Amino acid sequence: MMKFLTYIHVYLIQAILNFLPFCWIDVFYDNQTYIGNQLHHPIYLFLWAFSSAIGFYYYSKKIWEKYNVNYIKKNHALICLGMILSCSIPYNDITLLKDLHVWLSILFVAWFILEWFLYIPVHLNKNSILFFINIGLSFVFTFMFGHITGFCEIYFSFTTNILLHHWMFQD
C-alpha cells in the first residue's frame, strides 16, 4: 500500500503541483513565492513546499536505511521542515525581512544537497551519478536565468523526487 501511495505522490500529486505554475506565471522569470504572495495562492505554495519536502524527507530516509547509511535523523527532519517554513514566510516591506524567505530557502536546500554530498560517496553508483547531474543542471538553470525562477524550483523539486523515488525501489 505504501509503495502505491509513493507512486501517487510522485507521479500524480507532484506532477499536478509542478504543472500549475506554467498556467499562472512566466516560470522563466517569476518564482513559486510570487504565486503564493502576489497572486494570493498561499495554500498552493504550502502544498507544493510540503509535498516536495515530504518526498525529500521520506525517500532520502528510506534510501539511507536501505544502504545502512548512518545519517543524523534530527538534522534531516529539520532541513525538510525548514524548506516548508521558508515557503510559508510572506513578503515583507521591512528591508531586513524582505528576502528572508529566499535566504532560508537557499540555506535549507543547500543543506539538503550538502547532506547528500556527505552520504553519497558511501555508495557511489549510477543513481548517485544521476543525482549529481540533477543538482548540476539545477545550478546551470539558475545561472542561465540569472536568478532562482519557478522553472528552477519546479525542476529541482520534481526531478529530485523522481530520482529519489526510483532509487528507493531499485534493488
Summary of predicted features, one role per range:
Residues 62-64, 87-96, 120, 140-148:
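Juxtamembrane "helix-exit" motif on the non-cytosolic side of transmembrane helices
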Residues 34-44, 91-105, 144-154:
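Membrane-helix interface and helix-disruption motif detector
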Residues 123-171:
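Terminal transmembrane helical module of multi-pass membrane proteins
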Residues 76-131:
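Membrane-proximal helix-loop-helix units in multi-pass membrane proteins
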Residues 4-11, 67-79, 123-133:
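Membrane-interfacial loop-to-transmembrane alpha-helix junctions, especially the N-terminal start
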Residues 1-69:
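N-terminal topogenic module of multi-pass integral membrane proteins
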